[in-house]
Amino acid sequence: MDLLLLEKTLIGLFLAAVVAIAVSTLRGRKFKLPPGPLPVPIFGNWLQVGDDLNHRNLTDLAKKFGDIFLLRMGQRNLVVVSSPELAKEVLHTQGVEFGSRTRNVVFDIFTGKGQDMVFTVYGEHWRKMRRIMTVPFFTNKVVQQYRHGWESEAAAVVEDVKKNPDAAVSGTVIRRRLQLMMYNNMYRIMFDRRFESEEDPIFQRLRALNGERSRLAQSFEYNYGDFIPILRPFLKGYLKICKEVKETRLKLFKDYFVDERKKLGSTKSTNNNNELKCAIDHILDAQRKGEINEDNVLYIVENINVAAIETTLWSIEWGIAELVNHPEIQQKLRDEIDRVLGAGHQVTEPDIQKLPYLQAVVKETLRLRMAIPLLVPHMNLHDAKLGGYDIPAESKILVNAWWLANNPAHWKKPEEFRPERFFEEESLVEANGNDFRYLPFGVGRRSCPGIILALPILGITLGRLVQNFELLPPPGQSQIDTSEKGGQFSLHILKHSTIVAKPRSF
């Protein structure tokens, strides 16, 4: 770092310290703030808790400070909520007050400062984007239109694994093939397109760019520059990479998918009012009507690439891992499928309603291994009240949904993978947020609308894999490693596991 930058930074630190002390004193008199560790000027609690604000570390802090606590991260207030009652306040009762989204330097780049739907602030733009995205993506009509495609993609996975000579002996990293399946599931909906194989050059570019985007956005390593603006110059190189990745991704979306669809113009299906057009046709209609611009179109595609593909893939991978490590549960699920559907009848989307144990396996996977354990952060635009405390305007609000679903005060032996709980003591709990102890998709205005797609895709995929294979750990291992890797608000398996898949004979 050159001396001029160092000098400016030191001067900035001194001035910020003076301002921070003054502001902290004034605000302390004005507000009754939630409890939390004592902050220091400039850095707040950052030096105490560090960058790694994952769900388990925040759970440890909740055990110390209570169901609501405040972390002062540099110049930002971070409020963490860890009880069903307070989660209900944030997500439902005061859903408008806490319905906005926080900004950070990296997500500002990847979303064009909130031109998307998922990360934009609460208001008219969000309502418009939600409406435009709901019809082509998140309705029962979409499920019925595309469920045959999901079933055929799952069937293709089964056939490819059967053809792999290593899969039944030394094992295969099945995630790679499932990733292609998930891209095809969503690109069918978005563009009426699919990729024939993992070797498809466009698929490889998409996968690489989306992976890099996920790594950059989910990393904790940029937090210091986001929390403490005067340290932001040190992020210059990191943010430059983010901008390059964003621009390359959006150009790929535009050149190979959006513009290609525009060239096709009206097709036979789009002229038939009784048939649902693919999603991009609906979105381009909104652009032609002047409701959104081209950037909004591309950021909708960006949201689906991130929020729909990867999160569902993480959950499928977790489900497979738990079934491998619990062979008795895997066999119980297989027995249910054989008994209800009969030998050779492959699981379809309508069949899921006849398979309660399969539904319970999906729900238990989402409980124990929640893909978005802290949900997407919320924010209050104005000063608010929560749990008897004052919450200053523009505070970042995290709901520790993983702890809500894994707190032994609310769940019987929550550390166990036990689908039976959803037949026994938790028989009334559903994934749609009907119980604030269990919020895998959130609830309320900013809940994840992708629940309507994720649940059937999870059911079809896990059902067909268990139906067609005995899933085992690789030779020499009694179990597969289920160590976690947490991100800004993600939870996925640390190591993509090798799975032995022995075909069954019917």
From Swiss-Prot:
Keyword annotations of the record: Heme, Iron, Membrane, Metal-binding, Monooxygenase, Oxidoreductase, Transmembrane, Transmembrane helix
Names of required cofactors: heme
Biological process terms in GO annotation: lignin metabolic process
SUPFAM superfamilies, sorted: Cytochrome P450
InterPro entries hit by this protein: Cyt_P450 (IPR001128), Cyt_P450_CS (IPR017972), Cyt_P450_E_grp-I (IPR002401), Cyt_P450_sf (IPR036396)
Disulfide bonds: none
Gene Ontology CC, one term: membrane
Membrane topology: Single-pass membrane protein
Induction of its expression: By fungal elicitor.
Pathway(s) per entry: Phenylpropanoid metabolism; trans-4-coumarate biosynthesis; trans-4-coumarate from trans-cinnamate: step 1/1
GO molecular function per UniProt: heme binding; iron ion binding; trans-cinnamate 4-monooxygenase activity
Function: Catalyzes the first oxidative step of the phenylpropanoid pathway in higher plants by transforming trans-cinnamate into p-coumarate. The compounds formed by this pathway are essential components for lignification, pollination, and defense against ultraviolet light, predators and pathogens.
Family the UniProt entry places it in: Belongs to the cytochrome P450 family.
Protein name as it appears in the record: Trans-cinnamate 4-monooxygenase
Protein's organism: Glycine max (Soybean)
